[in-house]
Amino acid sequence: MWMFKQDSLITALEIGTSKVVAIVAELNESEALNIIGFGQAPSQGVIKGQIVDRKLAYEAIRKAVKAAELKSDLELHQVYLGVTGQHITSSNYTGSHAIASLDRCITDEDIDDVMSNARRFNLAQGQHMIHVIRQQFMVDGQRMINSPVGLSGSDLGVVLHAVQGYKDDLHAPVQLLRRMKLEAENIAFNGLASALAVLSPAQKAEGALVIDLGGGTTDFAICSRGVVCHSGVLAVGGDHVTQDLATGLGCPFKRAEDLKIKFGSAIVSEAARGQVREITNESGIMDRRVNVENLHRIMAERLKEIFAIIAAEMDRCDVADMAQLVVLCGGGAYIPEICTLAGKVLELPVQIGAAVNLHGPSTIIERPEYATALGLLKFGAFDMVRQREASSKIIPLKQRLKNLLRIDH
């Protein structure tokens, strides 16, 4: 067994609709993450990102975790757990605080007070707060990203982005992990994790929309000026594209999935018009013909709808002008011409995302379908160093790590 310090190990666990992924990494003294273990298993008992059959889900999680343990030659005890599902919502909240000191100089205590005021929002019954992310401060109405401590003013304001979900849905995977003698060290919304994985500091500053096209859900997050300004979940993903094909082409779901992978496209190209493919059965005998143009049209309609919903949400929340770039990840990023369609609907340049500032096999860190799990490693590193800092009181380190996505909770 490799000799790693337990307090330097981070395990990410993503329980998706199509797959369960566990990745183990070591956080070294220079705060670099090195991947040392990987496990994956087909998902079972999960629909639209939420566990519906605990027995099946337990077995899928167990297989992925055991594979990661075997690869890393470690016995795992804690994980950073990714969560998604349509029960997850987000909102922005504001708080204000009058500066009481005679010299009107803003102190750390003023920061604590205004943050406390902004957090005084009411959650719906049964909801649990997942993240509270500081977006910006305001001093006498003037917006600023960095800490205003030391500045003078009469009124201090803050804007927070909060992500919340329902306790029962969040606790379901945690309970399964405990049956395996695993503890959830912390949980993170998958959409934020994916953004952590694939965005560079410059992209976060300039503004980017990250869309993770999963099997059962599509998670998204918008970063601008270095912070998350909006996020959300659509209960629509790649499986819905497959179901549309199964219905439209009159074939079983599994056959539709094969056709999507082999012949799919997000746009209807000229080359596809009138094209017909002969499809063989398991015995190698041709049993049907498929109109490729029709296949592409069915896929394009569903994918266009997904991007259009996100565009409408951005307009509704007045954040459309904050993104200068779209980064796609998740398994859906492999669909041919997906960038072309996304760019047309969202009217922005589009690229496929790959993890940044991680060390490990290229077969893992460069694959868009692992963005969430890789982002969970970064979230875990942020959380781990924050805990170390809390005991050692190293203020500069704390401030530096808070800038990761300015997650205050």
Regions from the PLM with identified roles:
Residues S224:
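A cytosolic small-molecule/anion-sensing beta-strand core signal
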Residues E14, D212, V233, G330-G331:
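Small/polar loops that bind or transfer phosphate-bearing groups
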Residues M1-K19, I23-V210, V227-C229, G238, ...:
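Nucleotide/phosphate-binding catalytic cleft detector across ATP-hydrolyzing
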Residues G237, V241, Y334, E369-G375:
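Catalytic-loop motifs flanking and including active-site residues across diverse enzymes
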Residues A308-V326, I335-G353, D383-V385:
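ATP-binding/phosphotransfer module of carbohydrate and carboxylate kinases, centering on a glycine-rich
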Residues D219-A221:
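A structural feature that tracks compact, well-ordered secondary-structure segments
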Residues L81-Q86, Q324-Y334:
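Glycine-rich beta-strand-to-loop/alpha-helix junction loops that act as flexible
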